[in-house]
Amino acid sequence: GQENATWYRSHFAAVFSEYHLFERLYGLYDMEPERVRELLVTMQISDKTSFEGARFTTLDLSQGQRKRLALLVAILENRPILVLDEWAADQDPSFRRYFYEELLPQLKREGRTVIAVTHDDKYFNVADRVVKMEYGEIVPAAAA
């Protein structure tokens, strides 16, 4: 019931393939502006938008850059489990590599569990565990 919903909301952050961005960081009232600026650099969008007066200066970004900003906000929520639905699909090859080979391992070192839904089989080797689904069903590991 409500207890489970509250638990899930406090433990999961997500960036789905369909998402919405806000200029303000709602619900993140004690956020240090310097931490936001560091993440803008990490996401390689500090030259496109900045964080001033508790808001982003622009959301007028490419689709890939908007997804980076959405991931930045999810990271700031500081929840232990991060669900990313086809997150890398809109990223250029360079940032996609950075995401899988640098950013995901960093999130793991920070103690986060990342569930990355992806078709990027080139990067399956980065995962601790790969779960394959076909037609909405999990395929046994031997068949995957």
Model-inferred region functions:
Residues 119, 126-143:
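H-loop (His-switch) and adjacent beta-strand-loop-beta switch element
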Residues 15-57:
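Conserved "ABC signature" C-loop
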Residues 69-71:
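Hydrophobic anchor residue at the start of the ABC signature
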